[in-house]
Amino acid sequence: MTTGSKETKENYIPSAEDSQQRGMNRREFVTAAGALLGTTATVGLTGANAQSAEAGKGSDVKRASPGHTETRPVTNGGPWDAALKTVREWDPKWAETCEKMTMNPWRKSVLPRKIIELISLALNAACTNLNQDGTRRHINAALDAGATRDEILMVLKMASLLSIHSCSLGAPILLEEAKAAGVQLAPRKTGEATPACDKMREMGQWNQAWDPFYELDPAWTDEFFATALGVYASGVFTPKEVELFSIALDASYTHMYAPGTRRHIKAALKLGVSMEEIMEVLKLCVIQGVQACNLGVPILAEELEKRRTRKS
């Protein structure tokens, strides 16, 4: 599907054939559609080289060679805002060491600058974080790095759909505890149409982890999958890039969703993503911890100034 196409509708579920006509092959479609939803696709290609080459089609992102760590100049503050200047004044030694560590991905070329900023955006905008200042900072930095409106919007959609893990956690517990308490679901209509879920089953991509919330509310589950399929089959990002974003969202310190982290690391490796690239994503997760300083240091400075003023 062409970026920004008006063809996508609310509950449109693209078929593999539709995706081929829009520049995606079946493997790319299945991989992209299953990314956030917790599936791994291995359709039609064998061998890491073939997978890697296919995954890169249609991408304008220049890939760094695995293990290549050429130093490059930093043109922005990375994860930092003005708080860094204050930290330098208060504790220059710690500020120097912390800045060196946190700016590492921006100084190295393991990942393209645009992808670094989009991953950082995902971490800040995620429904488990909702950091307004960080979201604005990395949207601006991503635009400066060449990201398009549709790419940024896609990251925000992914950051929104992360919330499905509430059902991944809670639905099995609800069924178990209801059974123990002797409580049963109220009768409902049989034969409800669930085309999105049916599509996933046809492709062999249905995950049994979804069975509990499908059992509890099949119609709503299908609505969710229709939403997710419409997003991930768009072709805005390559399957490799989708997996990197998914790893970041699941491994984030505000989420720490182990099943998804493992699933997406496994899928990324199968697609030819290097260990170094995946480690960069994990580093970016850790580095966003300096948001504590971005938040707290200005408040501390303000409160200290108020006390100083009252005493004088």
State where each predicted segment sits.
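Hydrophobic, ordered structural segments
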Residues: L153-L175
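A cross-kingdom feature marking solvent-exposed beta-strand/loop segments within repeated
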Residues: R136-A145, D150, I265-K266, K270-L271
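Amphipathic, charged-and-aliphatic alpha-helical interface segments
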Residues: I116-N131, E241-Y257
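Acidic, glycine/proline-rich low-complexity segments that act as flexible tails and inter-domain linkers
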Residues: T2-G23, E28-G44, Q51-I115, D144, ...
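Short acidic/histidine-centered micro-motifs embedded in hydrophobic/aromatic stretches
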Residues: A122, V155-A159, E177, A248, ...
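Short helix-coil transition sites and intra-membrane helix breaks within transmembrane domains
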Residues: C127-D133, S163-C167, Y253-P259, V290-C293
